């Protein structure tokens, strides 16, 4: 399932605003830097304490992109195949914040996940300069909640598992545990210290938090 396009585009009242034309530039920058930055992430996994994925909650996993190729998975950071990860971690749902080209290059797409018995949701978002729209955050949180309540684990990823996917997991923590944006990010960093959010992601989380608070007030009244 693919929902919408890229969040944070100019004129989107639910995204972080940038001048017209910036979206195109940011998309091109993300494409050009995709492979170099992925190589950096693979190297950091080998020379530092970083893990390819970390459990943020008992049934919520935040991580980097699962590779389609067994060779890449075994040699570039995952240290096991994606199929092995699914079985070992009990993953039955995956949310990808990647754009199509990222998954087409080396990631797992819907049919590949289906063969492993895993539900898949793609919420496309450009890396670094944009944040998921509020609609995408709500859709992602609902999907995560459904998987968790079924007793299985959900794996949320982007390229490195530190910005786009971290934004969604933070929204989930706010919705399910009543945390504020700063508290949610601090909770994630306890398990995954290299999480990195920029102004657009913080703005999206603050907007989402307002929505959660409004819903809570409406339930009480």
Q: Whereabouts are the PLM-identified features?
A:
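Non-catalytic regulatory/accessory regions that flank a structured catalytic core
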Residues: 1-58, 210-221
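Cysteine-based protein phosphatase catalytic domain of the PTP/DSP
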Residues: 43-156, 171-216
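Conserved G/P- and acidic residue-centered "switch" motifs that form tight phosphate/ATP-binding loops
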Residues: 161
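Hydrolases whose catalytic domains are alpha/beta-hydrolase-1, hotdog thioesterase
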Residues: 164, 168-172
């Amino acid at each position: 399932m693919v929902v919408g396009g890229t969040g944070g585009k100019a004129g989107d009242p639910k995204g972080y605003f940038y001048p017209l034309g910036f979206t195109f530039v940011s998309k091109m920058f993300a494409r050009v830097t995709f492979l170099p930055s992925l190589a950096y992430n693979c190297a950091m996994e080998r020379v530092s304490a970083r893990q390819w994925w970390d459990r943020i909650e008992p049934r919520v996993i935040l991580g980097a992109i699962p590779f389609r190729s067994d060779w890449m998975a075994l040699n570039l950071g995952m240290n096991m195949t994606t199929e092995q990860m699914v079985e070992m971690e009990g993953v039955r749902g995956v949310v990808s914040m990647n754009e199509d080209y990222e998954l087409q290059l080396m990631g797992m797409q819907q049919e590949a996940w289906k063969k492993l018995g895993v539900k898949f949701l793609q919420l496309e978002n450009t890396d670094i300069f944009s944040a998921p729209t509020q609609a995408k955050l709500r859709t992602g949180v609902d999907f995560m909640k459904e998987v968790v309540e079924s007793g299985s684990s959900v794996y949320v990823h982007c390229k490195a598992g530190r910005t786009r996917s971290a934004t969604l997991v933070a929204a989930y923590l706010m919705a399910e545990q009543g945390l504020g944006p700063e508290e949610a990010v601090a909770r994630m960093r306890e398990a995954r210290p290299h999480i990195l959010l920029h102004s657009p992601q913080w703005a999206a989380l603050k907007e989402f938090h307002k929505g959660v608070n409004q819903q809570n007030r409406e339930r009480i009244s």
